[in-house]
Amino acid sequence: MKRKERRKQIMNFGQAIEALKGSKKVARKGWNGKGMFVYYVPAGHFKSYTEIGKSIADKDDLVHYNPYFAIKNVNDTVSTWVPSINDCLAEDWYVVD
């Protein structure tokens, strides 16, 4: 028995940004990597562990960061992500379930 594939609503980058802000994961049909997706990381903080981190930490030893986009890579690692011009102009974005 074949599994039914759910139809994905295709979006432009502006719509993808709105989905990201709404805590959704998004990806592009044009990406070759299986399982890759982008998600929004809200502002927060982490404990400083490096000398540079300690030099900018607050009195509680925390480094504060601004919101950013992250990408889950094919090898299951995560990196910060900045869209290319091709990503910005693409109209093949979809929400990942």
Task: Name each model feature, range by range.
Residues 2-53, 57-59, 74:
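Catalytic phosphate/metal-binding cores of nucleic-acid and nucleotide-processing enzymes, i.e., regions
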Residues 21-22, 63-67:
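A short, compositionally biased
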Residues 48-49, 61, 91-94:
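Short, surface-exposed linear patches
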Residues 65-97:
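Short, compact, well-ordered microdomains
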